[in-house]
Design a protein with these regions (language model features):
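Short beta-strand micro-motifs in enzyme catalytic cores
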Residues: 2-4, 201-203
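NUDIX/MutT-family hydrolases
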Residues: 3-6, 14-48
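Short, conserved phosphate/pyrophosphate- and ester-handling motifs at nucleotide-, phospho-/glycolipid
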Residues: 28, 67, 168
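Active-site-proximal alpha-helix that buttresses catalytic centers in soluble enzyme cores
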Residues: 42, 57-145, 150, 173, ...
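Short amphipathic alpha-helices and their capping/turn segments at secondary-structure boundaries
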Residues: 48-58
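Generic beta-sheet signal
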Residues: 62-63, 159-170
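Short, solvent-exposed aromatic-acidic interface loops
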Residues: 217-224
Length: 224
């Protein structure tokens, strides 16, 4: 079982209740701990409040995303940059749109390869966001100058924006290494930064930026 910390959305509809849960109520961490009856739950709330050190909305996510499933490289006869998603990849991109919405992403950055652009396009369209083309994270650019891909990640990390960066499998090791040391998470570090992310899978880095300094407070991984 894994837990997340998030800010309550006042515009969310009332909780309808389930067979196990009658009512949903948000209270400050201190009051929540006082109302809990199981010591392990108290420890969980205390640890979460201590780790955050500030309200969850003081952080912003940066998502490193591998494009969804593309057409076969061997069978494609045109330029590789124009290789499209296959039907499964198109369906995955639609599913990703829902997942990305959970993180409030408002900045969409992508390799200018068609398969990457089409991976993030459904989400960008849904939230009316402009898709920024980032040529430094294409496969060709990375092969010639990998430092550029790392710089692109570090710039996004320092921006403090809630952003997603979509790129390619061969580029992922450079992008993930550019994140720097990651804090303890629910995942072993090798799993979080596994360089073999499957198509459509992503790593989320939660960070806060203050005075030009970047503090990563949490990291998670989702396999599509």
């Amino acid at each position: 079982m894994r837990y997340w910390a998030a800010r309550a959305d006042d515009s969310a509809p009332p909780w309808p209740g389930t067979a196990e849960i009658d009512r949903l109520e948000f209270v400050p961490a201190g009051r929540a701990a006082a109302r809990l009856t199981h010591p392990r739950d108290v420890d969980l709330v205390t640890a979460a409040a201590s780790a955050l050190g500030a309200p969850p909305d003081d952080t912003a996510p940066l998502i490193i995303l591998r494009h969804t499933k593309a057409s076969s490289r061997k069978r494609w006869e045109g330029p590789d940059a124009d290789r499209p998603l296959d039907p499964k990849g198109t369906a995955q991109a639609d599913r990703l749109s829902v997942l990305l919405a959970c993180y409030g992403i408002d900045r969409v950055v992508s390799s200018d390869a068609l398969r990457c652009l089409d991976t993030v396009r459904p989400y960008a369209t849904a939230v009316r966001a402009h898709v920024e083309h980032e040529p430094r994270v294409t496969e060709d650019a990375h092969e010639k100058a990998p430092q550029g891909a790392g710089d692109a990640v570090r710039e996004l990390l320092a921006s403090g924006d809630a952003a997603v960066l979509c790129s390619h499998r061969p580029v992922l090791p450079t992008l993930l290494e550019a994140l720097g040391p990651l804090p303890h998470s629910a995942f072993p570090p090798a799993d979080v930064t596994d360089q073999t992310l499957s198509p459509g899978s992503f790593v989320v880095v939660h960070r806060r930026v203050a005075g030009g300094e970047v503090e990563v407070v949490g990291v998670e991984r989702h396999d599509l």
